[in-house]
Design a protein with these regions (language model features):
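Outer-membrane beta-barrel transmembrane strand signature
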Residues: 196, 301-326, 331-341, 414-465, ...
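Surface-exposed loop/turn segments flanking beta-strands in extracellular/periplasmic regions
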Residues: 287-305, 392-442, 487-502, 545-573, ...
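Extracytoplasmic gating/loop element in the C-terminal half of outer-membrane beta-barrel translocons
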Residues: 309-312, 496, 567, 608, ...
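C-terminal beta-signal and terminal closure region of outer-membrane beta-barrel proteins
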Residues: 674-675, 738-743, 787-825, 902-907, ...
Length: 1015
């Protein structure tokens, strides 16, 4: 369940279990005590009326009942002096002496621990769910580990409303794309901010060459975390919830709370998750027709080859082991964990390995007035040959387009020893043919790309409770990593990528991030009013450095060392670096009245180093909100457990990219010289400004049903783009600002949870609808040299797709994902395709709208059934709307290896109007034309399936709990018209390359098992 199980739901579950057990015991007791005559009855109540399902027992006996729907109970067989014990989850247990009275009403007081659900919100502070004026969704850590993924964010797909998550197509450990409430910025970041235990984390990515030709997609910072260390995750989808975190939170926040030690006991947990991956969604290809002599394309006669590209792929394995220790006393609690993640990919000689070591200690001293909380993590990661898509460093072009008449076993022997050269050379008699074709086995074994990363994190917080209503806290976090990226391209690799003796690239990058803040908190109550307020300041400092070398090998083939690089021709030293710092002050306040009205407000002022040379050195933003608990304002019926309405308004600023307000001098590795920037600095740039409001309703009914719905709308102003400058200015362009991008939508979650005896059932459905629209794009821009307006286009071209004639083009009235094509088959005045037997088909040059890569609706449905330790869980997910495009399908048609092209040949050709044209002639014309390779992205699938059994603890003398289970992921694609998995992302770092397939690695179906032991 996304929402924390409510107190009322827990009470209902306990009531049903108690009713079944206690009434059986009461019946048995009655047979044994027929001679007893003492009888008492009454009603159990709380401040709101009768309490249903409370356990009423005679202390020290099995004589007991549960209260009925009116809170009534009746006990017999009592003796004077017996003690009646009344208990139910959420209330303080009450004991009352029996003195012979026939009537005894008992009033219960709610337990302070269960007065209200609490969720973790901004700054890591737990707040009453009733008080929140914005939407927050919380998931427990157990929901992330049921079906483990090397990147735990992929486990959230379909389980959180308002969040779109795309898995990277490069397999386990790859970065994920997380977008909340739509894409807001033309040039800025759209990714959510990650916050660990209240402290922001810099979510760096170690990918390179991020484009539709990407060769090494890499991972990101959040993928390094061990999901077993996570206690809970809160998703703050709106700016009102995230306003205190600064400009990085403009696109929402993922709040991660990690585990602590446990007071009073020692718990050791050991877990293993092993899964196996097979290629799932893959293009349909043919092996019936072969290639004519001297041709690569398979447009020849029937050969009925047994070639099957699927045989190239391995069965991938993903093994995750974890051991943790939680222990503690009242004064000191400790948590330690070790985790290993070892993955072999579906591509030969590819994999991902990660090793996590974590510890956390919480100590109280000075009469429990001071709390010191310290944590540390060390992570080692090694990934090899991660491949996403594109023509470069990708085995799939050669694999898919391989001529069907030829012998694949010759290709499997990918290198042959050349006695004249003295080393082995590649065997691939076809060349790259302009589409990056290489021997797939050579790519995986002799074009080796590897990342090795070491990362350590340290955090500490010191809290001093000055009084019972005032405390101060200071926090610091250090997050550093070193990453080494190497490319080893062996001699005879295609000359596009390597020199005659091979090529070598060796780059080391370092990132050092330090965050610190100080916060004072007031929590005071005056009669019916209460105040919770925070005021503080923070500093966030990030330094990045990269140094490396890239070039062809000179003297010794296949000797990969810096001193063997060709220093005269193709030697390219590489060095980059930047230093960002932000400073801020912030405040928040929550005023409550009688636990039914909550007024909240926040304010933050930022000073950003990126703005240092502009005329606007800082920027401020705020939020206000109101929450009204209607069910607490009147005597609500018993079936209505909670009814809350809420609303909020927020503004959040977001800084633009560095180096836009100052001339800088980049180094040109080709000419070994410095050059001035081609971009004129604009000192009048302002931060992006997102203004958002939302209204929502939260309700809980009949102790089992919860319903949450939110409507939101946001507008993001000060969009940054580039305006062209005349050549006489000495610059090419300058940054300018304008625009207004609107997102509006609905987030909805509906859940039900109940139990009957040994059987339990829970279900949760989430739905997100988002509309993205560019309300305003470009204003006039003034030439800073002449003072005259610069003529601007009424559109911005943001992304082109290699292999297809399509671009993402932004226009007023359109969306941030609109795709346009440029060629269609010529048609006559009657709408028929024009075909001249002598000239063939022809194309018409015209810009036309293909659709948007942004989905309209995301949904998910998760259900759990439990019985006597057996748990069955299923998750269905779906997306409606949007388009995807496939350059892969275009290439398959061009080379005659698609099943579609074989079917056309079987049918005698392609039917055009009333005639038939040869299939090869038809596909030759439409190859590369996006209009014919665009597909609906709508899809529905059985995303996850879990079946587990918790063995009875008595089997282990009550000293151990053991759970074993079966897990599956991507088990059934219920509906999908696209020829590849439309939810995979070949490039998670850009909005403008979503929904595009260029020899993308296929998605996988994963099946495995898990074991968990707890001592």
């Amino acid at each position: 369940m996304v929402k924390k199980i409510s107190l009322i739901t827990l009470r209902c579950c306990m009531a049903i279990l108690s009713f079944a057990a206690l009434n059986l015991l009461a019946s048995a007791e009655a047979f044994a005590q027929d001679d007893l005559s003492g009888r008492v009855s009454g009603i159990v109540t709380d401040a709101g009326g009768p309490v249903i399902g409370a356990a009423v027992m005679v202390k020290g006996t099995a004589n007991g009942v549960t209260t009925d729907i009116d809170g009534a109970y009746s006990l017999s067989g009592l003796k004077s002096g017996d003690v009646i014990v009344v208990s139910i989850i959420g209330y303080e247990t009450k004991e009352v002496a029996y003195t012979g009275q026939a009537k005894l009403d008992i009033a219960l007081a709610e337990s302070a621990e269960f007065i209200d659900d609490a969720v973790v919100t901004a700054l890591g502070i737990k707040r009453s769910e009733k008080a929140l004026s914005y939407n927050v969704q919380e998931m427990k850590g157990d929901e992330l580990t049921a079906v483990k993924d090397a990147n735990f964010m992929n486990s959230l797909v379909g389980k959180v409303a308002g969040v779109t998550i795309n898995s990277g197509s490069n397999g386990p450990g790859g970065a994920s794309r997380v977008v909340m409430r739509g894409v807001k910025s033309i040039t800025g970041s759209y990714q959510a901010l990650y916050v660990i235990d209240g402290i922001p984390m810099f979510n760096f990515a170690n990918s390179t060459d991020a484009s539709n030709m990407s060769d090494q997609p890499g991972t990101d910072g959040v993928a390094d975390l061990n999901p077993e260390d996570i206690e809970s995750i809160s998703m703050l989808t709106g700016p009102a919830a995230a306003a205190l975190y600064g400009n990085q939170a403009a696109s929402g926040v993922v709040l991660i709370t990690t585990k602590k030690g446990v007071e009073g006991k020692t718990t050791i947990t050991i877990s293993n998750n092993t899964s196996f991956s097979k290629v799932w969604q893959m293009p349909e290809m043919q092996s019936k027709y072969g290639n004519p002599a001297g041709s690569i394309g398979s447009w020849g006669s029937v050969v009925n080859s047994d070639y099957d590209p699927r045989n190239f792929f391995n069965t991938g394995t993903n093994v995750i082991n974890s051991v943790s220790l939680a222990t503690g006393t009242q004064k000191n609690q400790t948590y330690l964990s070790v985790s290993t993640t070892n993955t072999n990919g579906i591509l030969p000689n590819s994999g991902y390995n990660r090793y996590n070591f974590s510890g956390r200690n919480t100590t109280k001293f000075f009469k429990d007035k001071v709390t010191l909380d310290m944590g540390a993590s060390f992570i080692m990661q090694d990934d090899k040959n991660l491949t996403s898509q594109g023509l470069y460093y990708n085995p799939l072009p050669g694999l898919y387009l391989f001529p069907r008449s030829d012998n694949w076993s010759d290709i499997q022997l990918y290198e042959r020893y050349d006695s004249a050269l003295g080393y082995s050379t590649v065997f691939w008699p076809y060349g790259n043919d302009g589409v990056g074709m290489q021997n797939p086995y050579w790519v995986q074994n002799r074009e080796v790309r590897q990342n090795k990363k070491k990362r350590y994190m340290f955090n500490a917080s010191l809290t001093y409770d000055i009084t019972d209503w005032l405390k101060v806290a200071g926090r610091v976090k250090v997050d550093n990593y070193t990453n080494r990226l190497t490319y080893k391209l062996y001699a005879t690799t295609d000359a596009i990528w390597a020199g005659p003796n091979g090529s070598y690239r060796d780059i080391t990058s370092q990132m050092n991030n330090t965050y610190a803040d100080a916060i004072a908190t007031v929590n005071k109550t005056w009669g019916d009013f209460s105040l919770n307020a925070n005021v503080g300041g923070s500093i966030n400092n990030t330094v990045y450095e990269m140094l490396g070398y890239n070039g062809q090998l000179k003297d010794i083939p296949n000797f990969f060392a810096i001193h063997n690089l060709d220093m005269t021709t193709k030697y390219k030293p590489q060095q980059e670096g930047w230093h960002d710092q932000s400073q801020a002050v912030f405040a928040s306040a929550e005023l409550a009245y009688k636990s039914m009205l909550y007024l909240t407000g926040t304010y933050r002022q930022d000073w950003e180093s990126k703005l240092a040379f502009s005329n606007y050195k800082s920027f401020g933003y705020y939020s206000v909100g109101l929450s009204a608990v209607i069910s607490n304002m009147f005597n609500a019926p018993r079936w209505l457990n909670l009814l809350k309405v809420r609303g909020s308004y927020a503004t959040v600023g977001s800084s633009y990219d560095r180096f836009m307000t100052k001339v800088f001098y980049p180094y040109d590795g080709e000419s070994n010289s410095w050059s001035s920037s081609s971009t004129y600095p604009n000192l009048d740039l302002k931060p992006e400004d997102t203004r958002s409001w939302e209204v929502g309703l939260n309700a809980k009914f009949v102790n089992s049903v919860n319903f949450d719905i939110t409507y939101y709308k946001s507008n993001t102003y000060n969009q940054t783009f580039y305006a062209a400058l005349p050549a006489a200015s000495g610059y090419i362009n300058m940054p300018a600002q304008s625009g207004n991008v609107m997102n509006q939508g609905i987030e909805m979650a509906v859940g039900y949870a109940n139990s009957w005896g040994d059987f339990s059932f829970s279900t949760n459905y989430t739905l997100t609808w988002n509309e993205n629209k560019i309300m305003k794009l470009i204003d006039s821009v003034i030439n800073p040299f002449t003072g005259e307006p610069i003529k601007m286009d009424d559109k911005l071209e943001k992304g082109a797709f290699g292999g297809l004639d399509a671009k993402v083009i932004l226009k007023e009235g359109g969306s941030m994902g609109d795709v346009y094509g440029y060629h269609l088959l010529e048609r006559d005045y009657n709408g028929y395709i024009e075909y001249d037997p002598d000239k063939g088909l022809s194309l018409k040059n015209e810009e036309f709208y293909l659709g948007s890569i942004l989905p309209k609706i995301n949904m998910g449905w998760t259900t759990h059934f439990g019985w006597n330790g057996i748990d069955l869980g299923v998750t269905f997910t779906g997306r409606i709307g949007g388009i995807v495009m496939s350059a892969t399908e275009s290439y398959l048609d061009q080379y005659g290896v698609s099943k579609r092209s074989a079917d056309a040949r079987d049918a005698g050709g392609i039917k055009i109007n009333n005639g038939i044209i040869p299939a090869q002639d038809y596909y030759k014309v439409i190859t590369g034309q996006a209009a014919y390779y665009t597909y609906d992205a709508t899809n529905f699938r059985l995303s996850e399936l879990t079946l587990s059994y918790t063995l009875p603890s008595k089997w282990f003398n009550d000293k151990m709990n053991m759970t074993v289970g079966f897990v599956g992921k991507n088990l059934w694609m219920i509906y999908c018209k696209a020829p590849f998995d439309p939810e995979l992302s070949g490039n998670v770092s850009s909005n403008y390359y979503q929904g595009f397939d260029s020899f993308m690695l296929p998605s996988t179906r994963n099946i495995g098992f898990n074991v968990k032991l707890q001592f």
